[in-house]
Amino acid sequence: GECVVAGMGQERAHRAAQLLADRGARQLVSWGLAGALCPDLASGQLLCPAGVVDAQGRRYPVTTDLQAHCLEQVCLGAVTADLVTWHETLVEPEQKQALYRRTGARAVDMESVAIAQVARERNLEFVVLRVLFDPADRILPASILANTDPWGAVRLGGLVAALLRRPSDLLRLPGLARLARRSGQSLKAMADALPALNQDKNVDKEPNPL
């Protein structure tokens, strides 16, 4: 098995999935963070959805037996409701509510549909393993988002300048740090459980950057 770190966005995810398929992968796993669209979901919760939905409402179901195996071995108690892939980060609670009403999906990410499309084209098994980062009612600071690169690293110089222009965002940073710790702990716990999946499903958690 092999893991490719693709960065954020559908284009990067599609390239990574194609690369893995070209290298002989039999299963594709969409792994990372997601945002809540539904108010009953909390930061740090695990997601293993039954399907992913694109912006046009097309649904891509995951491989049922692979999902069941993940729910038993990797993410016991995970949320299994559908996830929607969107083209940008949703900053305001109103945006999240609108997408929830439009799609019925309970969570959102920026990559899974692209991976699902490659899995369908190449006849590969597919599953999603995600951790919720931001609750549906949480505002994400624009200064942070504008200065975060596709790999999730923050450009400190740009962030300082943005915070000087929007000092109110400073008040949101402690809460954002708590979300990062909570979701990071859940991601680590899920990663620690992956060897049980590797034994049967040939998934490797060692990253090879794209």
Residue positions per predicted region:
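Regulatory input/activation interfaces that engage signals or partners
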Residues: 132-200
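Glycine/charged-rich beta-loop-alpha catalytic/anionic-binding loops adjacent to active sites
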Residues: 1-3, 53, 96-102, 170
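Generic structural signal for well-ordered, non-membrane alpha-helical segments
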Residues: 9-13, 63-67, 92, 108, ...
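Intrinsically disordered, low-complexity terminal tails and inter-domain linkers enriched
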Residues: 199-207
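Metabolite-binding pocket within alpha/beta catalytic cores that recognizes anionic/polar moieties
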Residues: 1-75, 83, 106, 121
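Active-site rim beta-loop-alpha module in soluble metabolic enzymes
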Residues: 64-141, 145
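N-terminal hydrophobic/helix-forming segments and targeting peptides
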Residues: 70, 208-210
